[in-house]
Amino acid sequence: MNLSKTLKHVYQEAKVSDLFPVTHLNSPSIFESQSGLVGSVIKVNGAAFEIEEADTLNHQRFLLHQALVSLDSRFIIYVTTHRQKISCPLIGEFKQGFAKDLDERYQQRFQDKNLYKNTLYITVVLKGDDSSKTGSWLQWAKSLSIKGNSELSEHHREQNIQTLNRVVEQLQANLNPFGATILGKQDEALGFSELLQFLGLVVNAGQTTSFKHPVYSPPIANSIPQTFKQEAKYPEGHLGQYLSSCQLLFGECIQFQGNTQQDCLFGAMLSLKKYPTNTASILLDSMLSLDCEFIATHTFAPIGRDSALDTISKKRSKLLSAEDKALSQTTALSDLEDGIASETLLLGAHHHTVMLLAPNKSLLDAAILEATKRYGSAGIVVVKETLGQEPAFWSQLPCNQHFITRASLITSQNFVDFCPLHNTQTGFSNENFLGGAVTLLETPSKTPVYFNYHARGSKTNPSKGHAAIFGGNNAGKTTLVNFLDAQIGRFGGRSFFIDRDESSKIYILASGNSSYIKIEPSNPIAMNPLQLPDTSENRSFLKSWFATLVQEESERVIPSHIAEIINDCIDYSFEQLAPEFRTLSHLSQFLPVDFPRWPHLKRWLKRNDSRIDGEFHWLFDNQHDSLNLDFDKVGFDVTYLMDQVHSVIATPVYLYLLHRMRQCLDGRLTSFIIAEAWQLFASPFWEKALREWLPTIRKKNGHFIFDTQSPKTITDSPIKHIVLDNLATLIAFPNPLADRETYMEHLKLREAQFEAIKENTPESRIFLYKQDHEAFLCKLDLSGLSQYIRVLSANTQSVKLLDDIMQEVGHDPELWLPVFYERSKK
């Protein structure tokens, strides 16, 4: 082919700008087409639907219909759903070790799988009054070059822009429950044009680009950076020449060809051919979990009231002339007629396409089959466009309604059912003081969910972050709790564990810079609270602590005369005794012989000439205090305290541990993780401690995480209101025996959320994650990470294996972890 023929083919090739209707922006939020149509775009977060009951969905439908029914035949409405693959990087850094390795492997899973985000847009185009005499006259005036007519046309254009602005701002206000914002309003803060980004979606296969353009290129410049120093968000010239960044090839499928062979995507156009018998707002929800990228477009062009009534009249006449006895049809027509006459309904032309996108043709074919199947299950017939492929493609763009070939008249209620603004929710990643999410979870719809313990709040002050995790044995609670603790390490915090059955021992010790203490007689720990430094806070604590040592089982407060003796004794020990002499046995020598609680105190004392070792002497009657909390993670196994001793024995231990933990609150993010909390909620000590700590500890950047089998352990507790009112996060694993009253009345779950807990199986590993009014069905997918799971959740056998390995190679996790990974596989 010679050069002249090549040039001829180039000139004959259709330009994107010839078919791209939008030519320029009138303002950051208003675009205009070649034919003078003006439009604006509203971005919508959407409404949750996956675990919402019918009443909620119906109310959302009502709100949306009320918002749209205010538009008349001067407008065309486009609802666009853009489903796009995304990556979700998380901020924060891990120290070297187990948590860093786990995070790298876990994040790799998200890079290797398809995760999607659905973004919804409503485009409102003002096409003007093209049916009236005024509209026809203005069209005629535009064709004349008379100065007066041009001025009149310009005046009419300005009026259209004002009308559009007013209508779109009102629509945005009405759609506030759906999280609506007008594109272009935040351009200055973002540094690019949101509206241009949206307008470029279709011609760029859904690939979003933050377009920037140099204002000018001076003929002489000192350097290249100076040449491009100034940038504009809004280009000059035809937008169609500016927005397209790839070559469009139409054939068996649509090919979006970039500058390299690998930079290529394939698309297919599906169009709605046959409508379902009935519509509902859940009609096309299954498309929001389709495993491919797509752009779905619904167009609705209301017709005038008189035209609509005339159309209904003609339809009724046809039924009567055909002697069609279908009473339901004539009744429906009468209802429709009433709705249109009273302006509570609209009748309009509807058109729907979906452009499926894939990196190769085989994946595209699979997407076509799956999408067709999902439409079919909703009673809808769609066809893959062949001859009509190119018109269907260009019809997705606002102001290209002349390319629509498969429009049908439907009501505004039907239109709302086709595009109810449903969307999968993703949580938040940067809306509290941490500046990022703890981790990323996955929904059954293959959309990501940002997990946070803390509620939305100030960027400078800690928000509440207490959490309750409910699940039966083997539900996966321990694995999840420890995984989340490893992930929150990205913020450099610390954790204290009140553990049971050593279930978190392996994880804590694997984390490095950690300590794990099993509190039981066979593993005595040398604690001596009397060795605390002499401060008013410590003196006050020791007086309360000593009182618990001699408390009766049924006693909440000791008698005042006994308290006075104890207080004097504590003061004397600090004022008269050197630290090395402040032991429980030594202090007891200063108590009067007739001290009424000697029998209670002796059980805590070591032997001397006049007594044998008390049963619990190993706990506190020690020469030195070896309790060291200067670690990133500290675990206490308190199974012995939970199962084998009365609460009057456990209380002094808990009291001292919590006092020392409280003194560690230095502003670092601190997690208190309570395993099998159901046993602690029954304790008078914990009732008092939590009543005091839960409302206030956030001020020191602390939060509690309660792991328990049933919500009833909280709802039956005397402090249920303190706990529930201060919870920021709730996680519930499936429970076939879930009690409706407990979950719905006390935990404030909705019907659909409760049913999800009751109907899913524990084997599914799906759980409900709830924060405030948002709820998500999530799954922690650790498949392929079995060696990490064996660390995150321990059992008797694996703990014994760990103990044996540490005896062999030492306590450094860098030494014992590889050995544990290998041996625990067996």
Predicted segments, located by residue:
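Conserved P-loop NTPase
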Residues: 750-803
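Conserved AAA+ ATPase "SRH/arginine-finger" region at the nucleotide-binding site
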Residues: 518-521, 729-738
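Extended, folded cores of ATP/NTP-driven motor/assembly subunits in large transport
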Residues: 1-416, 420-426
